[in-house]
Amino acid sequence: LIDYYAFGNAEVDVAEDFEDIKKEKVYQVLMGARVEEYQEILKGVQGAEITAWWDRAVDIIPVNAGKGAGIEKMLKHYGIDRSQAMAFGDGNNDIEMLKAVGNGIAMANASDDLKAVADEICGDISEDGIYHYCLEKRMI
């Protein structure tokens, strides 16, 4: 994952010892993991869940604190009906987000699981799929 973030010139703090992390108030953990490792990773951990955004990368977040919950709170705060909201996603960590809005749009390169819950599918992210979708819908 360090190499992944280095691509965008982002610096990443890497904890060498998990005991050091437990001393801090942690809101999210990003780590490399495969689906077959999830159960072992969360063994003994209370109130957390894994959302995968790549087949080798996951976020560990508090239960009910994912993108969907965030969208719902924002819609409520600003008084926006979910039918008036849309979201784009490409990974399994976007499933709850797409379910929380009136129009959930999966990218062409999205996971099959995300496409299954999407209302629509637009072009690939590498081919400016969001831009072309917005052009087609006369949003821009």
Region spans (language model):
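Conserved acidic, metal-coordinating active-site core of Asp-based
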Residues: 1-88, 92-97
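Short, acidic/turn-prone active-site loops that include or flank metal/cofactor-
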Residues: 55-58, 109-112, 126-130
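Short, charged, surface-exposed secondary-structure boundary motifs
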Residues: 60-64, 115-121, 131-134
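Well-ordered alpha-helical segments embedded in enzymatic catalytic cores
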Residues: 70-73, 129, 133
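Acidic, Mg2+-coordinating phosphoryl-transfer loop and its flanking beta/alpha structural elements
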Residues: 71, 81-118, 123-125
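Generic C-terminal helix-cap and adjacent flexible tail
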Residues: 136-140
